């Protein structure tokens, strides 16, 4: 049996971020072989990950990746259990790897992503990376969702508040316009706008019909509760719906950097200055943990259950 030195244990720990005693045992179990030791730790990590599967991962980050010419982009939400871990370099680095994978490998969905070979190391799948990260970080790690755009125009991404909010927007423009700095700035400003103002659609035609009808019902009930005459209620509702459109439609929102302009008028200015036709195709906005019910621990109840 090969002699296990402290240097061998240290090297394994640096490569895996696993605990010192686990690394020592892995070296012993693998007779000093590095690759077998890493495999042993990964197998151990899989059982650890299973123990963590029931935990709720509602913290984390939204990460992004765009290719060099800005024609392909991706945003992903990767979750962990605590805000402390979400701020660590290890976790953020892992999330960035996943964003790169989505952009370059174009998976159909999260399940397909998990099965893909990692673009930077084909000997591992993304599922392997998740398991490795779980071992190294010590919390449940999960890839929740992603969005990917590919275009002949411009894709711009923006990450706000250290990964709490992530935005991606696609703008159509010809090749000459894509290289224009004003167009690039406009696309970036759009991403900022979406992060701050939370639009629900690009234009009126894209507003969810069911949600719009519900809004009309609410506005009508409000007007009637205010004692307004029935004959003017419909006109009031239409007026308030106009205001609603200005809140939820990106093109009709006031520009966050200049409230005297709408996004539509700003786009017209940029198109004229750049000598190019511009249009906003779509956007994605992810907010970390939205829709996930966070666990509320009841320590007394847990202790009582353990003593039964």
Q: Which residues make up each language-model segment?
A:
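N-terminal assembly/interaction segments in proteins that build large macromolecular machines
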Residues: 2-308
């Amino acid at each position: 049996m090969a002699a296990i030195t402290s240097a061998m244990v240290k090297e394994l720990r640096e490569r895996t971020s696993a605990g010192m005693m686990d690394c020592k045992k892995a070296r012993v179990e693998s007779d000093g072989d590095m690759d077998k030791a890493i495999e042993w730790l990964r197998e151990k990590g899989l059982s650890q990950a299973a123990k963590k599967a029931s935990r709720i991962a509602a913290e984390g980050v939204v990460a992004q990746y765009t290719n060099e010419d800005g024609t392909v982009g991706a945003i992903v939400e990767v979750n962990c259990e605590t805000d402390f871990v979400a701020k660590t370099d290890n976790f953020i680095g892992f999330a960035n790897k996943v964003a790169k994978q989505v952009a370059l490998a174009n998976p159909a969905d999260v399940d397909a992503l998990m099965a893909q070979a990692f673009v930077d190391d084909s000997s591992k799948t993304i599922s392997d990376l998740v398991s490795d990260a779980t071992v190294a970080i010590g919390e449940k790690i999960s890839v929740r969702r992603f969005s990917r755009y590919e275009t002949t125009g411009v894709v711009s991404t923006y990450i706000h508040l250290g990964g709490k909010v992530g935005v991606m927007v696609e703008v159509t423009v010809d090749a000459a316009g894509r290289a224009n700095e004003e167009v690039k700035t406009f696309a970036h400003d759009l991403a900022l706008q979406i992060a701050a103002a939370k639009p629900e659609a690009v234009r009126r035609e894209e507003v969810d019909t069911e949600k719009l009808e519900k809004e009309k019902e609410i506005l009508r009930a409000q007007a009637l509760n205010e004692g307004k005459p029935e004959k003017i209620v419909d006109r009031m509702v239409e007026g308030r719906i106009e205001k609603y459109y200005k809140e939820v439609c990106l093109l009709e929102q006031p520009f966050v950097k200049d409230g005297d302009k709408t996004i539509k008028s700003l786009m017209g200015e940029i198109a004229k200055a750049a000598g190019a036709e511009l249009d906003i195709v779509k956007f994605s906005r992810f907010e970390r943990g939205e829709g996930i019910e966070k666990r509320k621990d009841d320590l007394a109840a847990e202790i009582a259950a353990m003593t039964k």
